[in-house]
């Protein structure tokens, strides 16, 4: 109950709220879909190109990226439809993204048959592209107009990673349901669905659950993480880390570094070739050589040429600089 109350206080959803605990981010997403369908009595789900929601069959269906996550694993559950995600780097405007939603309603499914719309406030696997407040408001308006449940998936971007406890706080828009996992308990397995009470209560009694749902040790770990975030000022530290990494990368002044995107300490930078095109080979090389020197890096993005930087918010400056120096040494060799 302590964790439920704490999340209820912090979640960017007004009114009466409830929380439900599971083990993995994918479970949280799956249960959001179950809740939304129970509330609306509708089957359809809309997600976004580049979105990442997990590795279960439903979550793979929601995910807007085929390789390596969906190929050879079908058929996928449906009906699920993918709208465009607006991002300057992807040459997709907000108007184009909203038009793609309208086309889904015209060509694929009537909005009266859509149960939920799910989006990451900051895309993870998709390349750390950020939802703007204006686009979030447009989605909120569309969902309100058609009685669609709006879900914000904060499994990767939540819990201080972006400089606020939830990235949702920076959008000025409230979802109906939201997910949390990963950093929720500092890597200990626990996830959560947080949402409006009237929607959370929609499934029949016993319809939601799990063997390890809300296990005491995981809940205590999550409460401890929330204490550390407050006591060590990790929201401010997140912003400081992101700004420092961005300044470092820009200071290298390398033509091979393309777009740099960050919200707090959630940062990604693209590697490009001399023609300005995605350089997957250079990205793979950077990951491999960094690993040889003791630094783990992960790639992301629709073209696989972005490096995601997700350092612990408790990282010491000396350790952070050591990692940055490894990146510099490889990119400038």
Where are these regions (language model features)?
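Conserved N-terminal phosphate-binding loop of PLP-dependent enzymes in the Aspartate aminotransferase
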Residues: 1-333
